[in-house]
């Protein structure tokens, strides 16, 4: 895990964060995804979705990854998980926005993602 304290100058380099009032950014993985002008799409949905909806979320994640689109979500169970699993299975890049530090993954079942 890396901890990055952003200066005002550094914040300008993170094009995806412009206008956000952030002092600390905790990350694991490729932080440059926040700097690149790539396509990013939020892939979210119901937590208690049925099997068909989960299959479709997984398929959407895969299609987005294959097109070079970065997927973003909140790492929740259900559609968020299915979409991330589809994107990762296709070799895609993903961003998970979490309300807590990286030392406490919630929900725990998504620790491997």
Predicted regions and their residues:
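Glycine-biased, small-residue-rich flexible motifs in mid-sequence functional cores and linkers
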Residues: 1-113
């Amino acid at each position: 895990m890396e901890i990055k304290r952003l200066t005002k100058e550094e914040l300008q380099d993170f094009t995806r964060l412009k206008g956000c009032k952030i002092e600390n950014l905790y990350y694991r993985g490729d932080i440059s995804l926040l700097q690149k002008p790539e396509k990013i799409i939020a892939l979210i949905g119901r937590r208690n979705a049925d099997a068909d909806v989960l299959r479709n979320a997984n398929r959407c994640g895969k299609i987005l990854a294959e097109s070079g689109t970065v997927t973003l979500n909140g790492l929740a169970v259900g559609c968020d998980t299915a979409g991330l699993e589809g994107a990762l299975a296709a070799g895609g890049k993903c961003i998970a926005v979490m309300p807590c530090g990286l030392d406490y993954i919630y929900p725990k079942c998504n620790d491997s993602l």
